[in-house]
Regions:
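Conserved acidic
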Residues: 1-194
């Protein structure tokens, strides 16, 4: 089972919709781009972003923590766009969370397109799609389709074995990568040892 994941879906939806206006959306995009560069250990690119402010912290020891800190900032800003209270990021015209809606509509359309090509969609959530027996053709199709809407798909995992319990809980055995042969559980049902 191939697990394709959209990198920073909601932030990229906010960027594509220019939700903060041109100037502030560009600044928001700089933070998102810096996080992605750090996550992929591209310290040279990250060092050029945000006027070099992150350069002193760009090393193997601090990379994961820095990427996580930027993720918190990004998600906080995104969350404030649809908060019920007044704040500088909230637009009162955004009554139905346009950022989340854009992503949800995209994933619905993607599911329909993948199924129309004859593939099974085992699981689809906010920013990921899982396809059993995925071929290179369908993976390339999904990546290209995502690019057309401003989304970048990455391979989150390839599972040798996969058990979907419900819409939010699954257990899988990694097929390859640094965790090859290991099992993972998503959802508290299988993570509590008693």
């Amino acid at each position: 089972v191939w697990d394709g994941d959209v990198a920073s879906m909601h932030p990229h939806s906010a960027i594509f919709e220019c939700i903060f206006g041109p100037e502030y959306t560009r600044r928001f995009q700089d933070i998102v781009d810096a996080r992605v560069a750090i996550k992929h250990k591209d310290f040279d690119a990250a060092g050029l972003m945000l006027n070099g402010a992150l350069r002193p912290y760009l090393n193997e020891e601090q990379a994961a923590d820095l990427a996580q800190a930027l993720k918190i900032v990004i998600n906080s800003i995104y969350g404030l766009t649809s908060a019920s209270f007044e704040n500088p990021f909230r637009d009162p015209r955004n009554i139905d969370n346009i950022v989340a809606k854009r992503g949800a509509l995209f994933m619905t359309l993607l599911k329909q397109q993948v199924q129309a090509l004859g593939y099974t969609v085992a699981h689809i959530k906010t920013d990921s799609i899982k396809i059993p027996d995925a071929t290179q053709y369908i993976m390339d199709f999904i990546i290209k389709f995502g690019n057309e809407y401003g989304y970048k798909f990455e391979t989150e995992a390839n599972f040798e074995k996969y058990c979907l319990v419900n819409d939010a809980v699954y257990v899988g055995k990694f097929k390859d990568g640094k965790h090859a042969g290991e099992w993972t559980a998503t959802g508290t049902q299988f993570q509590v040892p008693y």
